[in-house]
UniProtKB/Swiss-Prot annotation:
Its main location: cytoplasm. Residues 401-457 are annotated as: Disordered. The keyword Phosphoprotein does not apply. It comes from Eremothecium gossypii (strain ATCC 10895 / CBS 109.51 / FGSC 9923 / NRRL Y-1056). Residues 416-427 have a biased composition (Basic and acidic residues). Residues 446-457 have a biased composition (Pro residues). GO terms for biological process: actin cortical patch assembly; actin cortical patch localization; endocytosis. This is Protein LDB17. It holds the Pfam family SPIN90_LRD. May be involved in protein-linked oligosaccharide phosphorylation. The lineage of its organism: Eukaryota, Fungi, Dikarya, Ascomycota, Saccharomycotina. PANTHER family: NCK-INTERACTING PROTEIN WITH SH3 DOMAIN (PTHR13357:SF1), SH3 ADAPTER PROTEIN SPIN90 NCK INTERACTING PROTEIN WITH SH3 DOMAIN (PTHR13357). GO terms for molecular function: Arp2/3 complex binding. It is found in: Cytoplasm. Belongs to the LDB17 family.
């Protein structure tokens, strides 16, 4: 016998707390909506799915409060035979519902959460999402939310200061909550599926700009903040890949070069780089740093504050020391970043932890220190080459520094006496007087000859 709904709208709705009995009845009723025996056609599957999502959405904030409640809703559906036999259709239907403009926020959240759980549980489902224009649907919803928050929230320091009421803030908080799930879903698509160029071209300047300027750099605990940061990393990675194929402009890099827009992002990047243990995110952050340090020399030299540069150096030393043998690719990535820091930043003046770096690089230059099993791989050889290159950069810098010191300490050379234009000789002083007399026909000391006689007229 079919169960009745937990309560009717006339019974007080969400205004009163529910008893344990009512809570149990709610979950039993919700599960009964997915009874596969009653669904033999696509239309019946459609009706059952819509009823399930609608019922869960109506109890949002009442029976569904904590993250575990929403996870249970998702798990009940994803494990139901009705869903497993009609997965592609169910995904297309949920995306269709999500694309509705005036869809209630509670239903947006429930659908987004179910789709995210599905894609994390089975990465092949990302293909189904993309087949049914999922990228466009998710991107458009996020764009709508960003446009609203840009205008009516205080997410940005430059936002127009409107009179934000308590109701406005409640709406903003719900939009951030839904956006957190959608951002994570879009991250899954960009990170773990083949991103079509057309989808990447759809991302416009405002979308990237809003995520960058609305970041907070004082926390790593805010889920909405972290979701925006991760999506920017994933977008940058896709731009770097597509640049080799189609020369598509990297919008993330463009705003990185705008210090006003990227200030919060760079501060959060350094904070996350120092704290995160997720290897995938570490590599993605290294790609951002690599882009910055391979810019023009004057940009790379002055982009990071000296203290921030020292933090990056500390993190690199720590990670290079602690990486295990099976993570040699990650060590190679860190060494490439270190090489750029040693050659193209203010480290060339500070020489921060120089001796420790030399000792570490000396250790990494030997394959025997990297591979205890004796099974030397190409990654191990790359590590030794990169370590040698970094070590040479430090040694070359020390040689140049010594030359500069020696040149500064050497005494200044004495100025040379300028050579006369004409050489002076005194040889005429030694010529005998009689020779001079004979040459001119008279003594140079005799009286001058008389004047010539006057001409007669």
């Amino acid at each position: 016998m079919a169960l009745k709904p937990p309560y009717s709208p006339e019974s007080g709705g969400a205004s009163r707390s529910r008893t344990q009995t009512e809570t149990v009845h709610f979950w039993e009723y919700l599960e009964s909506l997915l009874d596969a025996a009653d669904c033999t056609s696509e239309a019946q599957v459609n009706s059952a799915l819509v009823a399930y999502v609608k019922t869960a959405s109506e109890r949002y904030g009442e029976y569904l409060v904590e993250d575990r409640d929403f996870y249970r809703v998702a798990l009940l559906l994803l494990r139901a035979p009705l869903y497993e036999r009609n997965k592609s259709f169910c995904i297309s239907k949920m995306l269709s519902l999500l694309s509705i403009d005036l869809l209630e926020m509670s239903m947006k959240f429930v659908i987004s959460y179910i789709l995210l759980c599905e894609c994390k549980a089975d990465s092949s489902s990302l293909d189904h999402v993309l087949d049914y224009q999922g990228f466009t649907v998710i991107y458009n919803k996020l764009y709508e939310h960003f446009a609203y928050l840009h205008r009516y929230s205080d997410d940005e320091e430059t936002t127009f200061e409107a009179n934000i009421t308590e109701l406005d803030e409640e709406i903003n908080e719900e939009l951030r909550k839904i956006s957190t799930v959608l951002l994570d879903l879009l991250f899954q698509i960009l990170k773990y599926s083949k991103c079509e160029l057309a989808n990447l071209q759809r991302v416009d300047d405002f979308f990237v700009y809003y995520m960058m300027v609305s970041l907070r750099s004082d926390t790593v605990e805010d889920m909405y903040n972290n979701a925006k940061f991760r999506l920017l990393l994933a977008l940058n990675e896709q731009y770097m890949i597509s640049n080799h194929k189609a020369g598509l402009e990297n919008k993330v890099y463009a705003y990185l070069m705008n210090h006003t827009a990227s200030k919060q992002f760079v501060e959060l990047l350094l904070l996350q780089f120092n704290r995160t243990v997720d290897k995938s995110l570490q590599i993605m952050m290294c790609k951002i740093i690599y882009l910055i340090l391979t810019s023009r020399d004057e940009i790379a030299m002055d982009y990071f504050y000296l203290n921030d540069l020292h933090v990056v150096t500390d993190v690199l030393i720590r990670n290079l020391t602690n990486i295990s043998e099976d993570e040699e690719v990650l060590r190679n990535t860190f060494l490439r970043i270190l090489d750029l820091i040693l050659r193209k930043t203010e480290w060339t003046q500070s020489h921060y932890r120089e001796q420790e770096l030399l000792e570490l690089l000396e250790y990494l230059c030997s394959v025997d220190n990297l591979c205890s099993s004796g099974n030397v791989k190409s990654e191990h050889m790359s590590t030794t080459k990169l370590a040698f290159k970094c070590r040479q950069a430090i040694r070359q810098l020390k040689v140049e520094q010594k030359k500069s010191r020696d040149a500064a300490a050497a005494p200044a050379p004495r100025p040379k006496t300028p050579e006369p234009r004409f050489e002076r000789t005194d040889s005429h002083m030694s010529v005998p007087m009689d020779k001079i007399t004979r040459a001119i026909g008279r003594s140079p000391f005799a009286s001058p000859p008389p004047p010539p006689p006057s001409r007669r007229v």
